[in-house]
Every structure is written in structure tokens, then in C-alpha cells.
């Protein structure tokens, strides 16, 4: 979301280990206020039954919304004035490969770091904000 909406004004959230299957928190709720006024709310639950799993990102604006899956179907649904249209595209087979190659090249000393330290620190700050308040 940082790529789409820019700098963050505030981030907060809660996390908990509901399932108890492992030591890490398995549910996270995160909220972000971006500097441009965009509001974000995310929910990640890693212990739902397979038939209840949902991979959905919705971006809602004053004229409609855009819905898409992050890891699922390669399509975007645009809803405007109550009417929906779908844009389908070919699923990228190796979507992470270019970044992995750059990271390997960086560790081999062949290129500069593909991600700045400040970007990494910002992502870690958001993760900490999402998970610092415990729900249980």
C-alpha cells in the first residue's frame, strides 16, 4: 500500500495468538492513515479453515471500488454506480523472481541494495505498530 498511497501519518493495530498452533501471533489487525488522507484497514488471520479463507483487497473511493486478490485469481473487479466490470490478465508465473535475483546479486556484491534501508525500517515500523498491542 505504501507504493500506491505514499507516506504514512499513523499506523496502529492489534495481534493475538488465537489458534495456539505455534508461538507466533496468528491474527493481525492493522490500520493506517496515509499523509494524503487515505485510510487503510487490514485483517490477516492465518488459522481460518481452508473453506473460509479469503484473499481480498478492496480499495473504495468516492466514485466506486476496485477489488482484487493478492495471491488468487488474476483479475480486478471495478464497481462504479452499482455496475461491475472485470479486467482479467495473465497470472505472473514468477512474480517474485526479479526481486530475488536482485537480492542475490546484491549479496554477491554485483549491484547496490535493491531496497533502501529507510524502506525496510518503515515496513518494520508498520509491522511493529500492527503487532505491539496484544489482543490476549
Residues covered by each model-derived region:
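Contiguous beta-strand/loop segments that form the cofactor/metal-binding neighborhood of enzyme cores
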Residues: 2-73, 100-111
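A structural signal for well-ordered alpha-helical scaffolds and beta->alpha junctions
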Residues: 1, 96-100, 120-123
Amino acid at each position: 500500500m505504501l507504493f500506491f498511497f505514499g507516506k504514512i501519518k499513523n499506523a496502529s493495530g492489534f495481534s493475538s495468538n488465537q489458534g495456539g498452533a505455534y508461538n507466533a501471533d496468528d491474527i493481525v489487525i492493522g490500520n493506517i492513515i496515509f499523509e494524503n488522507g487515505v485510510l487503510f484497514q487490514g485483517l490477516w488471520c492465518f488459522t481460518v479453515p481452508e473453506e473460509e479463507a479469503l484473499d481480498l483487497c478492496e480499495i473504495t473511493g468516492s466514485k466506486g471500488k476496485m477489488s482484487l486478490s493478492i495471491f488468487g485469481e488474476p483479475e480486478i473487479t471495478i464497481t462504479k454506480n452499482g455496475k461491475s466490470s472485470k479486467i482479467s490478465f495473465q497470472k505472473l508465473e514468477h512474480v517474485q523472481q526479479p526481486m530475488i535475483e536482485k537480492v542475490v546479486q546484491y549479496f554477491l556484491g554485483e549491484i547496490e541494495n535493491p531496497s533502501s534501508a529507510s524502506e525496510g525500517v518503515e515496513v518494520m515500523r508498520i509491522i511493529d505498530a500492527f503487532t505491539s498491542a496484544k489482543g490476549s
